[in-house]
Amino acid sequence: MKAVSRINNVTRNGVQKSTKCGIVVNAKAFDMLARQYSDPIKAILQELGANAADSHIRAGKQDVPFSVKLPNSLDPHLRIRDYGVGMTEDVVYDVYINYMKSDKTDTNSETGCFGIGSKTPLAYADQFNITTYNDGTMTMYALVKSEDGVPELNEFGSWNTEEDNGVEISFSVKEDDFDKFSDRAVQVYKYFNTRPEVTGNGSFAYPERKDIISGDTWRISKGSYSDNTVVVMGNVAYPVDIWQFEYDSKERGFLNNNAVIEVPIGDLNVTPSRESLEYTDHTIKGISKAIS
C-alpha cells in the first residue's frame, strides 16, 4: 500500500546545530513493537492472512484460497500456508530481520506497507517457524526471541521438494486459546475477497450473509454478520468510529446502520497496528466518497 505523503511544517530560524534522532536496537524497542496489538490473536491471523493474499496476488492466483490449519489437541500449531511466489533466501532475510522495511510501499495492489506484520507471531509466541517452498527447494527457518530479547533468525537447512511454491508460517498455541483462534479466524477471514480454506476445527464455519440493501461500494446485512460498521480495505476490516463525523451529517446517519463499506487500497490512512483507522482528512474524505 502506498503511503500517503505528509508535509512537515518546520520553522528553522536561528538554528545553529541539528542532529538526527535514532532508535536504539534493544529488547525494549522490539517488545514495544510486539505489544502494540490490543488483540494479538486477531492481529496475527489478520496480518499473516493479508501477507498470504498479497503473495497470491503477485503470483496471479488471487482467486486461489490459501490454507489455515487451526490448532487442536492432535496438532496444537497454527499453520498458515500460501501458494504464491515463495521466498528466496535473500528475501527471507530481508523481510524477517528488518523492521519498518517493506517492498509494498510503491503499489496499491497489495495490503502491506509498514514492514512489521510478518513478525506479528512474536506478539503471542517466543518463536515461530517459517518454511519456504521455492522452485523445488524447501528451507526451514525460525524467528526467535533471543536471550537478550532481540529477535534473531535461525536457518535449519534446505531439502528438495515437489511442493508448490509458497510459504508456511507456524507456531504452537496454548490449549486454552484454541477456541479464541477459531473465533478470531471467523471475524477476520469472513471479509476476505477469497476466503482461506480452514481446517483443524470441525465446527468452524463462516456466517451466512444476507444483504438487506446494498450499493456499489457498501452493503447492510441482516442479523449479526457485522456487529458494527466496518470499512474493508485490502481484505482487512477496520471498525468505523462514527463520532469522527458530525452528529447531523448524512455520513453519521448512514454509519449507524452496521454497514460494510469497501474502498480501494490506499483510500484511507490506518494505524501501524492495522487495528484501526487514522482519522485524517484523507480518511474522512475516503469514507464519505464511498457512501455518497
Model-predicted regions and their roles:
Residues 31-32, 36-42, 46-50, 67, ...:
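Conserved phosphate-chemistry cores used by DNA topoisomerases
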Residues 53-107, 147-149:
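Conserved beta-strand-loop-beta-strand hairpin that lines the nucleotide-binding pocket
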Residues 45, 52-56, 77-85, 110-124, ...:
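Conserved catalytic-core segments centered on acid/base and nucleophilic motifs
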Residues 26-36, 78, 107-110, 155, ...:
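Short hinge/gating elements
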Residues 1-63, 90-97:
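Bergerat-fold GHKL ATPase/HATPase_c domain
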Residues 152-156, 179-291:
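GHKL/Histidine-kinase-like ATPase module
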Residues 107-216:
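GHKL-type ATPase core
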Residues 6-9, 38-47, 74, 86-93, ...:
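Conserved structured core elements
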